[in-house]
Every structure is written in structure tokens, then in C-alpha cells.
């Protein structure tokens, strides 16, 4: 899908209620600014390192499926055209509706890895409001750098390690996150470095389940031994 789309993709992953409206306002503002620049024929766009609207695609994947319709309505209230994943017969590049849309809405289940693989950078849902964030290791494993907000307490250690390794960047809020993402999309060298850092971070953090089981094995063996003794004495 990524090669067929042939445009950078900015993803808002596992977005939450209270975050989407601000995201759409930022995307709408970027689109309006780009149209204004084109209308007055200025060179401001060429002087900016950020990718302007019309040269990237915005993908949003809400955390809760029951909110797909509400999220689409929020986007449309900002004058943004929406194309839903469920309406694509194949990939987005084969859908005229998708390629003309301002927002792609990931309204499917079990395809998060596909969405991350399609995207060049992801905003971490749940981190721009006091909701604790989401697990960002899946994004890293797909080679997708992350921009996150201040609220990552549910995954504090992973977020700190990702930030320290260059796989993620932390910003104050959604306006800063969108700008940081667009700047990354406009800087090929920085993007290559971020992708490499993401893959390396994911590789270092694979096998967490195996590590946990190894750590618990002595305890589990002790429990099994006690059960055998209790059964023998019964």
C-alpha cells in the first residue's frame, strides 16, 4: 500500500475522545494555509521544510470501534473529506474517493500493523489527554516513528526508552505533534534515522513474554512443589 500511495502518510493511532477534534482542527488549518499560499502564489511553501497539505495523507484509527461514526462527523465538521477503510475494495491507491479525501478513517479491526506499515509517522493516541497513552512498541516494530504527548503513564518505561533511543519524540500537545510530524515527513535524513531507531528499539524489546516467564519460573516451580506436597499429605 505504501508504495502505491506514493505520498507520506501521517497516522493518528488509537485516538481517543477529546483528542480527535483538535487533530482535525490542526489538519484543517494546515490545509487552509496551503490553499491560501497557492492562491496568492507565494514562495512561502517552498521555503518551509514541513510537508504542506495536499502532499501527505492523514490517517486516523480511533481506539474504540463504536466511535467510528462520531469521529467521521468531527472531521466533516471541520470541512474535511473522509474516506473509510471499509469502503476500499483494495488499497487506498485503487480508490479515487480515498485519494481525493483529506482524512482516511481506519474503521477496521485487526489491521493496526497494516496501518502502521502504511504510515511514515504516527501520533500516539491517549497521550495528548490524561489517558495514559498506548503501547508504542507495535509502531516501532513496523518501522513507524512516534510523536507522543505528555500523558504516557500507562507505558511510562517504554515511552522513556523510545524517546531516549530516537524512536519517539515527546511534545506538549497536538498542535506541536502535528507540526513535528510534518517536519519529519519533510526531512528525509531525519526520517531514515527515526525509522532505523524505531526498528532497533523494537528489536531490543522483543521477547518480553519469554523474559517474564523466565523470571516467574522459580516461583511457579515452588508453587507446583507445594501443591505436590499438599496432595501427598491429603
Provide a role label for each language-model segment.
Residues 1-234:
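Nucleotide-activated sugar donor-binding and catalytic core shared by glycosyltransferases
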